[in-house]
Amino acid sequence: MLSNVLNPSNVAPARNRRSRRRRRASLLSKYTRQTLAGLLAFFVAAFLLGQLIPSPTIPSNIVFISPKYEHYQAHKDDYDTLFFGSSRVYSQIIPAVFDEAASEEGLSLNSYNFGIPAMRAIDSTVLLEEVLANPPKNLKWVFFESILDKGYEPIPNARTNRSIYWHNWKNTQFAAQYILNSDESLPNKAVLLSSHLLPFLYHQLNVGRLFSQLLPSTFTVEEQTVAAEFTATEGFYALSDETTPERQYFLNAQQAYLDSVAVLGGRTADEPWVETVSDEAYLSANKVVLLNRVSETVRAAGAEPIFIDPPSLHLENDFQAAEQLGTIDRLLSYRDPNQFPQLYVPENRYDVDHLNRAGSEEFTRLIAKDFSQMAPSKAAQAKLP
């Protein structure tokens, strides 16, 4: 203080520094308020957009899903049988072959393949619910296939229209419940839950929706070609590209594939096949809820559910356990390389996970034959005159 009295020139710089600090604090506070106000205005505008321009159940810009949904909406009353699932339905069940084989068994059916590549448990169920919200008037049977995974939404998918469109409040809550009711650890549940956060936020903020609804949707030439092919074959798309990495790996690793088939069968060359489903079947609570939800959705549409376990090398036995526990009533399972060797021989496979066209025809005929034998009560309604 004495130095300031003796040296008054020191006071002014100190006051200037304090004044500058106050101005900076004031500006920071002002910018913070403006930023918060801007964010609030953005969220309100996004919400109002959602109210003024309601989002369609399935937008027109979703690869694979939109073309199938549009065809279905235009022709749904022509069908009495629908197939839902992943690529193991999309590229392995041929409606024309199924209908023909069913006719040979005395049944008159008209089916459509609603399989979509890379579908998993949650989004498969969501799609089923969306499609059957307005079911065909003559719907009798719905076949459902899915791997009951952990519920993870891959990060690369988070910003895609295919993931964003279904992450509304209702469906995201369903995904959260599926994860929370699983047997995963708390840290794993946190990771799984977080994977749905970004597509949920994008959906709520209507990212890209204004343009997708006001402007015509466009697909790549390849996507349009594929859509034209599966539209012409009632939703089925044959895997035939010999240049894909999956195909090349399969061709170059035949022995590894055959070894995996042996493991699936529970045997080696000198050991008999051993049933892989244990006597004490178990299914986690979240999977029970999901399968019940699928069955309830199908029955609410006036049809009966049939679950399919395709010929794959996955060792999970969720559908078999569900059947043992009474969670599902009807299951067609083909994960037995001894009972169905024709579905596992390399000449009928496209890659490790999928059948080729010849294998798909064989698989489809088996489904039609087994279906005709397992559901006589409902099938009687569809008998040929």
Regions found by a protein language model. Give the residues of each.
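Secreted/periplasmic serine-hydrolase-like ester/acetyl group-modifying domain
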Residues: 160-289, 293, 297, 384
